[in-house]
Regions:
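Catalytic metal-binding/acid-base residues of hydrolase active sites
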Residues: 62-64, 107, 137
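Metallo-beta-lactamase
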Residues: 79-93, 97-109, 125-156
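Metal-dependent catalytic neighborhoods of phosphoester/phosphodiester hydrolases
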Residues: 111-121
Length: 156
């Protein structure tokens, strides 16, 4: 069986460099990724589109577009290369064509595109897909605590 895969841009967020670089000294990382005037760096979000036989598989669905305007401003969300659905269309894939969505984990920047809002109601973005995630991750996402509550959104 032949696999064909493509990187699908799903957005960009602006984040504190500490999360990306941890203990690496600023003098080292800023040569490669200078921060903006707010001391934030861009983090591009990507999904993986896989064609496997007659199956269309999406690994992670990106941040989606359901966040409030305030949340979008806080995260600095942008779509410089278009939205996930626009980028899937470039490969001839409509949302109805996706057979499987594999979530590596359920943080919003990876699973926000699992659902969308239509007429004020949440519905699956990929209506014909089977959505998959590790059992332990699903448990963590549905049993949040004060530390994890903001990272797992029920609507995703």
């Amino acid at each position: 069986m032949t696999l064909k895969w493509h990187i699908i841009p799903t957005g960009r967020v602006w984040v504190d460099p500490g999360g990306a670089f941890g203990l690496v000294p600023r003098s080292m990382w800023q040569k490669h990724q200078p921060p903006n005037q707010d001391q934030l760096i861009p983090m591009d979000l990507n999904s993986l589109l896989i064609f496997s036989g007659d199956k269309v598989i999406l690994v992670d669905s990106g941040i989606g577009d359901k966040l409030s305007p305030k949340a979008m401003e806080i995260w600095g969300i942008e779509w410089p290369e278009g939205t996930m659905l626009e980028n899937l269309k470039k490969w001839g894939v409509k949302r109805e064509d996706v057979d499987i969505v594999i979530n590596t984990h359920l943080h919003s920047d990876h699973s926000g595109g699992n659902t969308r809002i239509v007429d004020g109601k949440i519905e699956p973005t990929f209506p014909n897909a089977i959505y998959m995630v590790q059992e332990n991750e699903y448990f963590d996402a549905t049993h949040t605590n004060v530390r994890t509550r903001a990272t797992y959104l029920p609507e995703n």
